[in-house]
Amino acid sequence: MKFLYLHGLGQKPDSWDRVIKETKVSDSSVCLSLAEMLEDKAATYGELYAAFSGECDKEHDEIVLCGLSLGAVLALNYAIDHPDKIKALVLIAAQYKMPKKLLKFQNMLFRFMPNATFKQFGFKKADVISLCGTMAELDFRDSLCKVSCPVLIVCGEKDNANKKASKELAGYLSDSHFYELLKAGHEANIESPEELATVLQEFYNSVE
């Protein structure tokens, strides 16, 4: 099995380093870069998803996808489109229907932030605003029934923006389990890497 990790917007691939180090599958783990996948492409969700799909399609082994925030959206999307390729799915701080008001507010904040903030994560400010704008219409509700693999849904106790949706998602997916990380916020992979790694490894053990 190959374990593919997807970070969130505002993170880099190394956001997963401490988590992966604590698991027993580090040798089979790869952290993908959202910025690299969008390099020389239009900054849209469609382009990002196409590039991510291409990375997954290269794998000949069964895949376990683990994504946080935007990474979770991409992972869920791929599991819907390619259920035969996915052995298991981990969705952290996930949304299955994009919260338009939240995205709009987020984009408004982005406009006031300096370019340097985005550059440290490999993005241009305009590209982040464009990318988030193209996600507003995403809605997977009618397609969730296509997900056939075991799913672990994780959300930080303090991640109020995503907890409700994460719990709802666990209810919609037939073979899923919800886990709340105590004292953690949105960036669970950075805030609670050891606890998250323990939860992930228990899940991985159950699907191997």
Where are these regions (language model features)?
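Short beta-strand/loop motif that positions the catalytic acidic residue
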Residues: 146-147, 153-155
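Serine-hydrolase catalytic-loop signature spanning alpha/beta hydrolases and amidase-signature enzymes
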Residues: 10-18
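Hydrophobic, aromatic-rich cap/lid helix
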Residues: 116-140, 158
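Flexible "cap/lid" loop of the alpha/beta hydrolase fold
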Residues: 45, 76, 80-81, 86-115, ...
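Gly/Ala-rich beta-loop-alpha elbow adjacent to hydrolase catalytic centers
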Residues: 67-75
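Active-site glycine-rich loops that stabilize anionic/oxyanionic intermediates
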Residues: 8-11, 69
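Catalytic histidine-centered segment of alpha/beta-hydrolase-like enzymes
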Residues: 184-193
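Active-site loop/oxyanion-hole signature of alpha/beta-hydrolase fold enzymes
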Residues: 17-21, 30-64, 198
